[in-house]
């Protein structure tokens, strides 16, 4: 009996639970249909879904309430479309504002840049007027210029690659007064305008055979700021290894500003030559020599009447040939000789050019069998030179600038030794030993002196 009652209660509970679940499901479905949103969007406007249409049909049983819902939903649709239009307009307006803001920012940067440039130019002008040193008139030249002059005496203390050349700067009284007058007139007539005093640059100093000095000036307009930069470059080039590195970086940083000036370009080529000498890695040496040769070529394109351009082009050709094969070295040898001779014709007082030509002659006279055969196969007229020609060029360099280079005196001793004059060779070795080591060549020559002196003395005793 108890089992029957228990079964009856369980069955009744299941029926009641099923009925309650059905009621809850029907209520949930009805509420869900009533609260469904207008979410579908076609061509930028909102519309009903299929389920919502069914809901509106079900509501037709109550006419008044259905009309209210229909009108309310129509207004909501219109309101949603208007809100969508407003939002799209706001987005477009925001994009236009961003575009305008970026344009204004770029315009502001341009204006600030122009104002800063103008102020810097004015400040440079003021500094040039106030702080440029007063330069007295000299007898060497009558123009404002940078030039090189061969020195005598203790010239071995000069720059490594210049070999006895010092930088001078002079300004004539007439030019100084003319410059002051023109600046005063421009100050009265023009306000807030950059005033640059253009100068003439001279690079060639030609000495007359009758001891009457005649200066040949190669003119190139250079402003005072560039002139000061070139003077600083010359000073650093004449200094230590670190100063030469500093000078190279100084010129490299100003290449964009002054890369069109011949005087700047050949000095940059000279700095590349310095860096080639300083560098220890073979690939770095080749890279510096190659890039320096390109700068020297660019300088020559500005005009071929500048001795320094020809000289440094030849030097860099020689430095580059050290890292090339026999055929390329022979081809470069012709180019080297051509430009060194051109430099001598333009500037016959340059002892370094005679020294370089002497080295070329000495190396050609000592070419090996393979190199001679290669030159004969490549050229109808292969390069030729004698030890005597090399000696004459070395002696010319020593005559122009006594004590020009320890390496030059050692090469003079080698020439005399090759010609069989051991006594004179020993004399020049002793003279070379008296000079200090200035360049890397000088340091290498010290070892050569130590090796040659005893051998030369023994040969002299045997004779």
Curated annotation (Swiss-Prot):
Residues 1-4 are mitochondrial intermembrane. GO terms for molecular function: microtubule binding. Residues 28-463 are cytoplasmic. One of its GO terms (cellular component) is cytoplasm. Disulfide bonds: none annotated. Residues 153-192 are annotated as: Disordered. Keywords: Coiled coil, Cytoplasm, Cytoskeleton, Membrane, Mitochondrion, Mitochondrion outer membrane, Nucleus, Transmembrane, Transmembrane helix. InterPro entries: RMD1-3_a_helical_rpt, TPR-like_helical_dom_sf. A motif (FFAT) lies at residues 146-161. It is a single-pass membrane protein. Residues 279-302 form a coiled coil. Residues 173-183 have a biased composition (Basic and acidic residues). The chain crosses the membrane at residues 5-27. It is found in: Mitochondrion outer membrane; Cytoplasm; Nucleus; Cytoplasm, Cytoskeleton, Spindle. Involved in cellular calcium homeostasis regulation. The FFAT motif is required for interaction with MOSPD2. Interacts with PTPN2. Interacts with microtubules. Interacts with VAPB. Interacts (FFAT motif) with MOSPD2 (via MSP domain). Belongs to the RMDN family. This is Regulator of microtubule dynamics protein 3. It comes from Xenopus laevis (African clawed frog). The gene is rmdn3.
